[in-house]
């Protein structure tokens, strides 16, 4: 039944609007859970990744919230963190599991050498936390940011040509622990430069329905496509 409804919505051009409406209400509910368990989730993920020798830092919307709002962005429905690593490891998986974080999704790019894992999603007490892997490119690091398919629903996209994605570039720098809602979490010492790279120079001004295409950032479209595997 679901697939039939999706096909009808796609055919009449209402699929994206329907998804946006459904996601809006889902995100409101998820934002409440983030406010309740978000800090605890960050603390456990940080402890797990510290045990594996990684500095887990805030990134994307969670970093923006820390810098601009000194907390979670209103209606932020998940957490974004990163590590500089070539991908996941069994050691990371074991540590995250030991701290109560369940692996629920893997995002990857198909290459001639196999799957290039770019991101993993974990859940802790209902809070989703996206772990982005950052790769080196000259004096920069970059992570991949998957976007919605141009016109297909996610199941069809995942089974065919995947999702468009961007490389989000930030300047390499050191990290230092800073207070975030009572917990000491790594943030880039060049947080301002990172936010400008990710959200443009006017990032301190909240923008409703922010669109990457209308802002000058360091996101680069490369033609690469992402796929996801849910658990």
Language-model features: locations:
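Helical scaffold of the NTase/Pol beta-like nucleotidyltransferase catalytic core
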Residues: 2-59
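Alpha-helix initiation and N-capping motif
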Residues: 2, 89, 188-192
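Active-site nucleotide-donor binding segment shared across nucleotidyl transfer reactions
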Residues: 46-79, 86
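Amphipathic alpha-helical segments
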Residues: 85-101
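Tryptophan-centric aromatic hotspots in well-structured domains and transmembrane helices
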Residues: 57-62, 72-76, 173, 180, ...
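Short, structured secondary-structure boundary patches
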Residues: 76-83, 209-210, 227
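Conserved catalytic core of two-metal-ion nucleotidyltransferases
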Residues: 26-46, 50, 97-188, 193-197, ...
């Amino acid at each position: 039944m679901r697939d039939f409804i999706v096909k009808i919505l796609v055919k009449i051009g209402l699929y994206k609007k329907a998804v946006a409406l459904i996601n809006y209400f889902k995100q409101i509910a998820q934002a409440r859970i983030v406010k309740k368990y978000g800090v605890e989730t960050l603390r456990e993920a940080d402890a797990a990744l510290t045990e594996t020798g990684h500095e887990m830092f805030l990134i994307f919307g969670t970093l923006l919230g820390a810098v601009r709002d000194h907390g979670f962005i209103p209606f932020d429905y998940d957490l974004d963190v990163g590590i500089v690593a070539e991908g996941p490891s069994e050691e990371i998986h074991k540590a995250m599991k030991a701290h109560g974080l369940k692996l629920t999704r893997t995002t990857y790019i198909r290459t001639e050498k196999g799957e290039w894992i770019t991101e993993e999603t974990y859940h802790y007490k209902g809070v989703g936390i996206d772990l982005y892997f950052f790769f080196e490119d000259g004096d920069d690091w970059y992570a991949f940011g998957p976007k919605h398919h141009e016109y297909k629903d996610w199941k069809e996209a995942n089974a065919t040509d995947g999702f468009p994605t961007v490389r989000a570039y930030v300047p390499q720098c050191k990290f230092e622990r800073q207070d975030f809602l009572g917990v000491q979490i790594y943030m880039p010492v060049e947080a301002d430069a990172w936010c400008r790279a990710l959200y443009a120079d006017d990032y301190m001004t909240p923008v409703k329905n922010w669109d990457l295409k209308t802002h000058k950032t360091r996101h680069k479209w490369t033609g690469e496509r992402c796929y996801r595997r849910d658990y």
